[in-house]
Amino acid sequence: GNSMGGALVREVLAREPRRVAGMALIAPVVDPQHAGRHVAEHVVAQPNPKLTHSLPQEQVFDFITMGVNQSFDAWRRYQRFILPGVALCDRAACKRLDQRYWLADNPEEMLGIYAGPVLIVTGKQDQIVGYEDQQALLPHYPNATFVTLDNAGHNAHIDQPEAVITLVREWVAHMAFAPLS
């Protein structure tokens, strides 16, 4: 699960742990209130004014305000993996969710301990959910791999795809040997 999807995946795991062989989270929401999060300031490690000034501003706004890596390759990944969801997004529904998008209970309080393979990837320059709050998840996931990628923001898989691909491949390999709880 990515971002809010990370909170939803944790909820599914808490409700049905016997049906889950493992969990991978990229920049998961931990604190539902933005004001309570420990977040980084937005930093662009690889600025590219030639690219960002030449793009339609309505398409590039989120890329510019969230992207740490603003290379042509990162823009292509953003177009392929992020923009389609943004285009299909129901803005009114998102506004309602943003006002209260948390679940009734903290998933980890319901879950307790989960010993399956877990991957948590965060970006050190993530100004949306940060990387510090996710460390509070670790006592609940004793077999977790926790990685904070430098030069990566909220879209760590866009900013540092090779690192994320390697981590996910390792997690998938662990999944092959993980019995269902």
State what each model feature region is.
Residues 1-3, 123:
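Conserved alpha/beta-hydrolase "nucleophile elbow" surrounding the catalytic nucleophile
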Residues 89, 129, 159:
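Residue-level signal for the nucleotide or nucleotide-sugar donor/cofactor binding architecture
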Residues 34-39, 54-113:
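Conserved alpha/beta-hydrolase catalytic His-Asp/Glu region
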Residues 34-39, 132-133, 159-161:
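Short aromatic-enriched loop/helix-cap "lid" or pocket-rim segments at secondary-structure transitions
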Residues 144-181:
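Catalytic active-site module of serine/aspartate enzymes centered on a nucleophile-bearing elbow/loop
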Residues 10, 14-53:
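Flexible "cap/lid" loop of the alpha/beta hydrolase fold
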Residues 92-139, 148:
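Conserved serine/cysteine hydrolase catalytic core
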Residues 3, 7-8, 155:
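Short alpha-helical segment within the catalytic ATP-binding CA
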